[in-house]
């Protein structure tokens, strides 16, 4: 599984996707990018951003407190200029950039940040807004001054800082958080501070974003702080794999998400770039339900593991962009341990169980 990457060619355009293809090799000034998406988005409440189509939109229209550098994996400033935490990671204080606004003109200040994380950390039953899966042990927020906000946790929460950089922590306006969960399936109801804003939507079919001309607050260590190079992005839901790749090769689209392994060569042969950035989370896997009587016995599952030639499957059906997993976690994920010696193809060992 692949997710969370930035395309330098688009500067202030952020995308998420698995095996995506982009037509340009240098920054493009002006124009509208035609983006063919495999599936329609479902809900744009930021904690729902883990679903690719949702995240691919949220990354354009929202900013985050921090930015995780995809090369170094370091957490760097974005809306938060700096931050501190206590020794046991139960308190975090963030100092915000001046002059940041949501697209409706309201300030992205400490009060707005506090409301966002109170909602993501505690949920909002009245509006049916669920708790974010990346925020644990959240207790409360405190607005210290208009540009300083402090968060408190019931237990040590060392992962919170990284959590502020994820898609699920995109910052939205106070008016957005006053809507019910069901209303946030309509992209026009999402007010963020990102480099693009929603112009129009044909639910389930098409979404149009336009660049925000007054945008001046990209991640602090990114060279381009101003507006996006593009004038806009048009997402068109195109479920059929053959139609997406055909449109790209015919020059009818500039970017497509979800490229099948067998289509990669014809794309690269025509000079297209394939972006398959590895996940920093959990690998794709085939999991069994232990309450299924056929595989309830651990020994049965172990036998199936060692009787399966995973390398042959990967090399036969996929491409180099689908490396064989060596753990449940991706090699770039925090806490990764190489478990290759426990995942071997060994028919003799399989028969021992």
Where in the sequence are the language-model features?
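Gly/Pro-rich hinge or "lid" segments in bacterial periplasmic/extracellular proteins
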Residues: 69-70, 74, 165-234, 240-243, ...
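Append "and occasionally in soluble cytosolic enzymes with long acidic Gly/Pro-rich linkers
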Residues: 77, 211-216, 296-353
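N-terminal lobe/hinge region of extracytoplasmic solute-binding protein
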Residues: 36-87, 118, 191
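Aromatic- and charge-enriched surface segment that lines or borders ligand/interaction sites
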Residues: 81-126, 144, 150-152, 294-296
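Short, well-ordered beta-strand elements
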Residues: 29-39, 81, 91-93, 113-117, ...
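Bacterial N-terminal signal peptides that target proteins for export
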Residues: 1-10
């Amino acid at each position: 599984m692949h997710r969370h990457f930035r395309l330098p060619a688009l500067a202030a355009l952020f995308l998420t996707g698995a095996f995506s293809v982009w037509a340009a090799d240098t920054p493009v000034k002006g124009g509208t990018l035609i983006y063919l998406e495999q599936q329609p988005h479902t809900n744009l409440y930021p904690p729902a951003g883990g679903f690719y189509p949702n995240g691919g939109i949220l990354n354009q229209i929202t900013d985050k407190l921090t930015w995780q550098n995809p090369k170094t994996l370091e957490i760097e400033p974005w809306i938060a200029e700096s931050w501190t935490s206590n020794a046991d990671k139960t308190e975090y204080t963030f100092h915000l950039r001046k002059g940041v606004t949501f697209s409706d003109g309201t300030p992205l200040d400490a009060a707005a940040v506090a409301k966002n994380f109170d909602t993501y950390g505690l949920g909002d039953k009245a509006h049916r807004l669920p708790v974010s899966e990346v925020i644990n042990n959240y207790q409360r927020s405190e607005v210290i001054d208009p540009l300083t906000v402090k968060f408190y946790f019931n237990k040590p929460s060392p992962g919170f800082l990284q959590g502020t950089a994820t898609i699920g922590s995109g910052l939205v306006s106070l008016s957005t958080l006053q809507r019910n969960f069901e209303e946030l399936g309509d992209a026009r109801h999402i007010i963020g501070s990102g480099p693009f804003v929603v112009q129009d939507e044909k639910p389930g079919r098409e979404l149009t974003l336009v660049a925000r001309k007054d945008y001046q607050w990209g991640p602090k260590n990114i060279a381009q702080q101003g507006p996006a190079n593009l004038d806009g992005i048009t997402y068109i839901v195109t479920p059929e794999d053959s139609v997406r790749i055909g449109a790209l090769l015919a020059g009818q689209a500039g970017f497509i998400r979800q490229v099948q392994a067998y289509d990669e060569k014809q794309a690269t042969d025509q000079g297209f770039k394939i972006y398959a950035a590895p996940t920093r989370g959990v690998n794709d896997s085939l999991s069994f339900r232990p309450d299924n009587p056929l595989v309830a016995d651990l020994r049965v599952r172990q036998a199936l593991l060692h009787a399966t030639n995973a390398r042959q499957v990967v090399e036969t059906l996929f491409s180099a962009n689908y490396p064989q997993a060596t753990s449940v976690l991706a090699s770039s994920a925090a806490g990764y341990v190489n478990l290759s010696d426990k995942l071997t193809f060994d028919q003799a060992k399989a028969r021992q169980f």
